[in-house]
Amino acid sequence: NSDYYTRQRVVQSAADPLHATPGDIGLGTRVDTIVRIHDEFTFTKLKTASSNKECTSYKEDILKEITQRFPDLQDTGLLNDIQNYYQAWNNFASHSYESSQKENLLNITNTLTYRVNDTALQLQTIHKSINDDIVIAVEEINRLGQQIADINKQIQSVESKSSSVNANDLRDKRDQLESTMANLVNISTFKNDIMSDSRYGGAMTDQGKDYTLAIDGITLVEGVNFHPLKLDTQASKDGFATIYYELNDETRIEMSNKITNGKLGAMLDLRGRNVDEHGEFMDGTITDFRNNLDTFAQTMIVHTNNIYALSAQDKMHSMDLKDMDKDMTLQNYSSYVQSGSFDVVVYNASGKEVARKSINIDASTTMNDT
């Protein structure tokens, strides 16, 4: 038996006796029908509980993955790099003329920027993987919905032959598909003409002829007919999928805000549901993480540039270069001048670059060349 097998009971009654002298001869019993011991109310509560569990479990798995990727232990992680960055600035402020402090600040800044960029990249990767999971989940929901519609057709065919014939195994299989779909998304099922009969063990409610399966009032399965969910990747700047339902007149109903539970509901909670006019998600846990990281990086850049701005000057000059001839190479003038290149960058009061000049130095470079 499968995990979704429902207990069944044979309903019997006395068979017509053989009439004889001196009295009737009993011929045992006959099978009237076979019924499922199934309580639809309990089954509905089970599906809801299962949907809640899958929603919570998926969120837990993703958030654990994020925690493992971004540890903030005492000596590792982004927090440690930020603390080192501030300490390097303090050391540089106290010993600004020491070249070692400048090199230390540069190295620690490179470490911090790498960590921020790597964190942003990993969050983007997780964001994309959740979107991939959404596409797979929608495809599975559509597959399950079509299978349920096909089973409904088989149930109608079997039970139309006689009022005493019940398609119990097919109903078990449909319950299995319902439970699987409930793990993915918040669904409601409606079965008209449900029969209640307590003679066969507990509060038995089963059967039901007309069948409807819906997500927040939007019908996916109506008897033998199935209406699929559809995906659109045009609204999002990153090509992330949005979920919609298309009516017969091709009117679209946005489904992301109607899907609130199950594994797919958790995916949308994490990735985001609503896209603005620029194609950016306006909600979602991972979206908030990425936005907060971007805000942190931008704030760090602005405040660091403000430190430089405090020492901004209208002009600069060096020491008098005695005995410096215009045709003398720089490296002949001083052994401290090494081959290489650097940029001279000019910023305005808003921190925007307004001019840049690249200086290249080699063995033949003179002051006239620069």
Residue ranges and their predicted role:
Residues 1-370:
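Structural signature of extracellular appendage/secretion-system components
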